[in-house]
Amino acid sequence: MNLEAAPFFDDVADGPPGGAAPWLRASDGVRIRVGPWVPANAKGTVLLFPGRSEYVEKYGRAAADLYQRQFATITIDWRGQGLADRMLEDARIGHVHRFTDYQKDVAAMVRAAQALDLPRPYFLMAHSMGGCIGLRSLIEGLPVQAVVFSGPMWGIRIAPTTRPVAWALSFGSGWIGQGHRLPPGTKIDAYVTSEPFEDNLLTTDADMHDY
């Protein structure tokens, strides 16, 4: 497997020593980025599945906690996220043609873990959108010994009164080739860049919000 060096922002990651982020290609040619951290005498490897609008460096602190416990980690920029290839010209839109396309990224990530000889057994820690991706991966036979899900996206909460409209809009926009457009009422900028800590709905940890 060809693992070409990719940009890696160690000062942003605040992760364990020896961080790096190679490029790799999914089976359909989409270029993605992974980030491994490996302590000496590791007891196994945790596959970190990020959520939407997240990226390798954001998991540096999580990797550091696991590193101190003698676990290697590897995380990923999903297609449309971080520094991975985009499906649309506007890099701010993390569009995918089909949600199952993420399984191609998972397969490439596992191949990278094997090529890097990351220690077994493998474990999975999946957050938000990564939880949705991770659940399908488990169903399809992801070779992990144990799993942790953090706020997994196993559904999208929609008020019962607006649900039929949302379903019709979602189906209809895809039918006419407009499935890449933002839903009404949403913003193109990432939530964390537009909401102050006091008003945010994602975390009660001020240090992590600032990080």
Language-model features, listed with the residues they occupy:
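An N-terminal hydrophobic leader/cap segment in hydrolases
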Residues: 1-26, 30-38
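Proline/glycine-enriched tight loop/beta-turn segments at coil->beta junctions
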Residues: 38-45
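The conserved beta1-alpha1 loop
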Residues: 47-51, 127
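Conserved alpha/beta-hydrolase
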Residues: 56, 63-89
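Alpha/beta-hydrolase active-site loop
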Residues: 94-114
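Alpha/beta-hydrolase fold nucleophile elbow
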Residues: 116-128
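Alpha/beta-hydrolase-fold enzymes
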Residues: 129, 133-211
